[in-house]
Amino acid sequence: ANIEGVYNLYEAARKTGCTRILFASSNHAVGFYKQTDYLDDKALPRPDGLYGVSKVFGEAIASLYHDKFGIETAIVRIGSCFPEPKNHRMLATWMSYDDFTALIDCIFNISQLGCPIIYGISDNDGKWWDNSGTAYLGWQPKDNGRNFQESLDKRMERPKPDAPDAVYQGGYFTVDPIYASEDD
């Protein structure tokens, strides 16, 4: 779906004259960066698995259709969009529903969008991503994952310092197998 479906989406947009798309990419397009790396919209892809690779493909299609046909796309590398962070890694990657809704409003109400990469996160302490390159959108996330840290600390232990969830931006996706079975 992330390969053929994205191509079909952009072809349909081209054929019907649609001029703007919000592409739901993912933090897993850059998941093999370490949590000590601070990324901006110029960071090269480092997918952490085949899912991340499929999102990089979608970002490339968005760029191609912008350059070739003028279809504007907000490439939103969504961190974690849930009512609240589900684990300690998500304290940095979390995006509230309110902040996502505000981002959508900005994307579809600005006169000229282009084809920017936007990190879909709230205004979290300890975030790994920099959206200053897309300040022209006027999006100002207001929520912060830190408000959930105390309840997370009570519910679960923090990951060990060498665990993928504590080392890589993509967390455990970096160790998921990309083959069908152990015999492959």
What kind of region is each of these model predictions?
Residues 16, 77-84, 94-116, 123:
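Alpha-helical substrate-binding/gating segment
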Residues 72-73, 107-132, 136-137, 141:
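Core catalytic loop region at the nicotinamide-binding pocket of NAD(P)H-dependent oxidoreductases
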